[in-house]
Regions:
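A structural detector for beta-sheet-dominated domains
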Residues: 10, 19-21, 47-49, 79, ...
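Beta-sandwich interaction modules
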Residues: 75-91
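Noncatalytic modules at the cell exterior or secretory-pathway interfaces
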Residues: 42-44, 86-103
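Low-complexity intrinsically disordered segments
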Residues: 110-113
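Short, surface-exposed beta-strand/strand-loop-strand elements in extracellular ectodomains
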Residues: 47-70, 106-107
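Short, contiguous, helix-prone interaction/anchoring segments in small proteins
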Residues: 29-58
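Intrinsic-disorder/low-complexity, polar/charged segments enriched in Ser/Thr/Lys/Arg/Asp/Glu/Gln
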Residues: 13, 41-43, 81-85
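Surface-exposed ligand/attachment interfaces on beta-rich extracellular proteins
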Residues: 3-4, 12-40, 101
Length: 113
């Protein structure tokens, strides 16, 4: 395992937030790395700050992310209180559909675990 895969997570851009809802996921957002940071890091710290499961949709376009959030097979379930670091394309779009009600999701681009 490369030593760079063991570094602590370092934020490299602004945190975005959205309210995952049901029955329809909101417009997808990007969490870009600061343009002054010379990296193509594609790691994202994702927090589900709610008491319900969120089905995270990720895609290369807003429409793809919304479609992916709409089905269990193409989404990533985030359990209540989840704090994950996941790797995606640096220009990915994110949205989510909640199991019920609304849920706040925070996404921070960066690098590390």
């Amino acid at each position: 395992m490369a030593s760079s895969s063991q570094i602590p997570f370092a934020p490299l851009g602004d945190t975005i937030t959205f309210a995952a809802a049901t029955p329809t996921a909101p417009t997808a957002l990007q969490a870009p790395v600061h343009p002054t940071t010379n990296t193509s890091a594609g790691q994202f710290r994702i927090i589900n700050d709610s008491t319900v499961t969120v089905f995270l949709g990720v895609g290369s376009t807003s429409a793809d992310a919304i479609a992916n959030a709409g089905a269990v097979a193409t989404s990533i379930p985030l359990l209540p209180g989840t704090d994950e670091v996941l790797r995606f394309s640096p220009d990915a779009f994110f949205t989510g559909k909640s199991a019920s009600g609304t849920a706040t999701v925070y996404i921070t681009p960066g690098q590390g675990l």
